[in-house]
Amino acid sequence: ADDLKSYVWNKRYEFHYTGKTAEPEVALQMALECDKKTFVLTDSGDNTTSGSTGWNTFVLRQFLAVKNLKKNILFGSIKDEYTYKQLDKININASEMIYLGMNKDELSKSVVLNVKKLKKADIILVHGEKVIGTLGQGILVHVIGTGIDIIVTNRTARMTNTLNFEEFDINWTDYDVVVLKQGYIFPDFKAK
């Protein structure tokens, strides 16, 4: 164990993060100014692939605050089991007023949204290109009067593969911006 520790410590300066990093306000501006589809924005502060909760609404609130938002945005995903239960009771294409956000802290502050329910699907676990199980369910909603779609989940979700979005009958590359809860961008999304 000591040899491994020494080896890793001695190689620490050779590590280079390959993605772009930016503070939230700068990242938002980069997404808004990007002319190409699809801009992938990671909410790395709520990285569900390394054990975070997935319930932060901070980035969502950033986009909602943009006046005259011209882009269409997909959030994959935000965990809120209470809102999920509320949405699960209504029919597809029905509208509902929701409070999305767990209110556990400032980052997960609840936001009031008028949404239309589009689709319910399993949150699949994917290894490579193979589905190996499920981890809860999600409901895709459209925020009425905006270009924002959100997958609301009943459990912490890891959207790491295009197959996750295919479960909801959506092509993530149809969106101008996709917000994922990842630290390192997974290969399916890194090409963008």
Residue ranges with predicted function:
Residues 1-146, 151-155:
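Hard-cation-handling environments
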Residues 144, 148-192:
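Catalytic centers of hydrolytic enzymes
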